[in-house]
Amino acid sequence: MEKEDKSFGIGMLDYNRENPESSGHSRVAVIRKQKTEQENNNLSWEDRHYIPDLHKSNKIKTPTSLADEKKSHNELDPKAQIKKLMETRSGGTYIPPAKLKALQAQLTDVNTPEYQRMQWEALKKSINGLINKVNKSNIRDIIPELFQENIIRGRALYCRSIMKAQAASLPFTPIYAAMTAVINTKFPQIGELLLTRLIVQFRKSFQRNDKSMCISSSSFIAHLINQKIAHEIVGLQILAVLLERPTNDSIEIAVMLLREIGAYLAEVSTRAYNGVFERFRTILHEGQLERRTQFIIEVLFQTRKDKFKNNPTIPQELDLVEEEDQITHYISLDDNLDVQESLGIFHYDPDYEENEKKYDAIKHEILGEEDDDENEEDEEDSEETSESEEDESVNDEKPQVIDQTNASLVNLRKSIYLTIMSSVDFEECCHKLLKIDLPEGQEIELCNMVIECNSQERTYAKFYGLIGERFCKLSRTWRSTYEQCFKNYYETIHRYETNRLRNIALFFANLLSTDSIGWEVYDCVRLTEDDTTASSRIFLKIMFQEIVEALGLKSLVERLHDPNLVPYLHGLFPVDEARNVRFSINYFTSIGLGALTEEMREYLLTMPKSEPKEQDSEGYSSGSETGSTYSSSYSSTYSRGRSYSRSTRSYSKSRSYSRSRSVTPINNINHKKYIRKDRELSPRGRERSSNRNSYSDLSRSSSLSRGRSRSYTPEGRLIESEDKGYRSRSSSPASRKYRSRQRYRRSYAGSTSRGRSFSRSPSYRRRLSMSCSVSYSRSPSPAARPISRSPARNKRSYDSLSYNRQYSPKVSRKRSNESRSPSPYTLRKQKTYHLNKRNEDFVVKMDKKGSESPVILAPWLREVDDGELYKDRNSESDSVRKQPRAD
């Protein structure tokens, strides 16, 4: 307080000396003195130094002084204002936008330092604003705006702004690196300057033990390495420095750096990559670090085990530069580097206007001339609208020109072909093909071109299969397109030669084995002799063999038993006719896939026989009905037959010999007395088809003998006729609908007894040559031995031998070899045993673990009921099968 009073007193003395007139005792002076003392008491000690000038600020401004001040303000020199900005390195004080525009309007001379300084400040603000706005979504829009600015002049400004922004927000480091990668392709000096400054910044921060600055600079360098702006040797040198004398902080920085560049190092420098991890393992085993740091290293090893799935080299949305366009700078950590600090300070440019024109030319080359034409287009919009309205009326009147040469389609195929051939791997090819602007509805052309290029190769290349697989898994549209291609190529596969056919089959086999297309495409395949060609069968063979090689036979069988695929496999495994079933079985067996046909083999044995169609012919008849012209005998129509019969009763033997060679017209028979309609029964044995063998004439004619005969009509009616002979029951064999040779035939004849006979019908040539057929029959002899007599001859009876002869034209006589074969029932039983044995072997082979599960019935055969198949046929033959044998 004493100092304040003393200073206050000194101030008052000085005040009285400067104003001698106030020393009077006038009233005005006293009032002024009191007022001054009151104001001084309210001021602080620092403000009391300005007390002598306080009275000047309290002077009332007159209107004339205000006008003069306003006039002087309006007449400020813009150069003087700009000079204030140039005095300081930071750029001076803030200038309001309105005042800045006024200054810029007054500065029109380009070659003045003031104008260039204003443009420098504007460039710095523009670059800084664009860098602060960039993110993943708008990076493609920010980069063209950045090229609009003269970043060659402001390259130091760009480096300073982006380093400052990256240090403030580390998660945006990949974005800043991607933007720098694009700029580096056009202006490599900018990328080199940024990398140089980052390396120098890391060295300084490492020497100062500035952890935050080390993390930011090393992180930025890591992403520049991923973008291939910097060589990987810089990252390895930084890791070596950090791991030479490991501390908790250096290990943390090294782990962060390796996590960012680990995926890239694993590709380009595997040896150094493994060496770094060995160093980490050694440090971890030493155990001199904190528990937290050890845990960080363990997490790094887990990241390596996961192949850096959370730290990709370049994120997909930031992959903006082609690999061959990038420029890599080989700068080492130990080099003498120049950061060029002077580039960040304003310098007067005497050739400012010329340099700006040069950059405009470069900008036009990079961005094109679209930006320059925007203003002109805006001015011409009004004129174009008026002209377009007039042109529309004229264009409506002109006829449309349709290009019939398909020039656009040819150009599209050419571009697709060149794209495929210029690609290194399938991923690059798919990426380029997706960028092609396909017209609507022309997607199938791309698929066709991929298949055609594949077919042109000398051998199948998996490159094309991977392309088709990738497209099918991209969207459902491409999958349906390739499924349509499968149907189209299967229908036209006969147009391709064998080598091209093989490549196409392997291509679709790859798509099917990887489930790229659905197996429903087999709906278009019908595997029959009439519906397939040699090319289509080769196509299916190659495709199925490739699928078996990819999936395995067991997986293929399980896939074909999938209930969802059953409606689409009826054409591949037909069950409509026996010949189609047999063809499918033989086809798959011949290509080594007989395991697919095990169920069809069983089905073929039990499948229902189709009803025979009644056919009339001159020489051959399926039954001895009244509508037939001739009555067929046991052998051919024109034949000479011998029969030997041996019957035993009471240990007595008898032989009968009969020979007949005539054609007996049915018209000569008394229809009132002899009425016969045969019911045909299919033989129980399996028929074997042979195109070379002739038809078997196996229908039977009625025996004109005395006795009582009983026969069944096809409708199931029983017709009896009485005669003075024995009673006979007969049944005709199957018709000749299928041209097959029947080896065995069962007949039942004799008086009140049933026997077993084995007969073999002559071949077609033998019938033409009218040769003989020999049949043997053995049956128990009845009490009264009736003898069949021909109506054209007198009836003679012998106890031991009967000889009947009918006259016919002379023909050559030939005897066939005598043979005796097992019954059809025995053959069927043996065949069923072998099939069951083979099925058991197949199940054991399919299940290597030894679990013999029952054979899975094919889904396309489940609808058949075996009971219904056997019901009708067994009912007819059970009565015969249950009869005890007489001998």
UniProtKB/Swiss-Prot annotation:
It comes from Schizosaccharomyces pombe (strain 972 / ATCC 24843) (Fission yeast). Its main location: cytoplasm. This is Pre-mRNA-splicing factor cwf22. Residues 677-690, 717-726 have a biased composition (Basic and acidic residues). Keywords: Cytoplasm, mRNA processing, mRNA splicing, Nucleus, Phosphoprotein, Spliceosome. Residues 368-394 have a biased composition (Acidic residues). Belongs to the 40S cdc5-associated complex (or cwf complex), a spliceosome sub-complex reminiscent of a late-stage spliceosome composed of the U2, U5 and U6 snRNAs and at least brr2, cdc5, cwf2/prp3, cwf3/syf1, cwf4/syf3, cwf5/ecm2, spp42/cwf6, cwf7/spf27, cwf8, cwf9, cwf10, cwf11, cwf12, prp45/cwf13, cwf14, cwf15, cwf16, cwf17, cwf18, cwf19, cwf20, cwf21, cwf22, cwf23, cwf24, cwf25, cwf26, cyp7/cwf27, cwf28, cwf29/ist3, lea1, msl1, prp5/cwf1, prp10, prp12/sap130, prp17, prp22, sap61, sap62, sap114, sap145, slu7, smb1, smd1, smd3, smf1, smg1 and syf2. Residues 124-307 form the MIF4G domain. The keyword Cytoplasm applies. Residues 411-527 form the MI domain. Residues 1-27, 366-401, 607-834, 867-887 are annotated as: Disordered. SUPFAM superfamilies: ARM repeat (SSF48371). The modification Phosphoserine is found at S662. The modification Phosphothreonine is found at T664. The gene is cwf22. Residues 618-662, 691-712, 747-762, 769-791 have a biased composition (Low complexity). Pfam families: MA3, MIF4G.
